Amino acid sequence: MRNEEKHALRRELRRARAQMGHQGRLAAGQTINRLLKRYIKKGRKIGVYWPMGNELRLDGFVRAAQKRGAKLYLPYIEPRSRRMWFTPYPANGVKQERKRGRAKLNVPQFAGRKIRVHGLSILFVPIVGMDRNGYRLGQAGGYYDATLAAMKYRLQAKTIGVGFDCQLVDTLPREPHDLPLDGFVSESGVLVFKHH
């Protein structure tokens, strides 16, 4: 599928998410955060993300995971390559190291000992769209795609897409390098994808 078709799809899916309204996203978000708690284990390293715009917020999950002793990590984008490292989720009051303004992605970056994605047990992946085969449509930055593709043969982390029901479609366009995720959690429940 050509880029302009992907752009149109992103626009459509973002519109659907926006049309849920603030209260709708809030209620669905609480349900999703509750469902995500099944992945919490003491000492388990879990990659989360910093939500942008109307992306699903993980606040409830983060609080529960911290309380129960899981180790949370946020993406740290290398300025020159498109690959991500992961740094420990900041304790309250920790100042962000820098803002990343390139490519319209204003993601706070935090200092700390960096690990690669294969050091995580679980990685929650933000989505613009998700299909029933486990393929995702992202923000178009390519950061998750590049990171997962580079770790393809070493990837121990379970990759879970998180988002709203309205972002789930039957099929999405895919590129040869795209890797399917292991699952998707929305307000309707948990989908597990079998890839064989």
Regions found by a protein language model. Give the residues of each.
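N-terminal active-site beta-alpha-beta segment that forms phosphate/nucleotide-binding
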Residues: 1-119
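Conserved phosphate- and dinucleotide-binding cores of soluble alpha/beta proteins
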Residues: 82-196
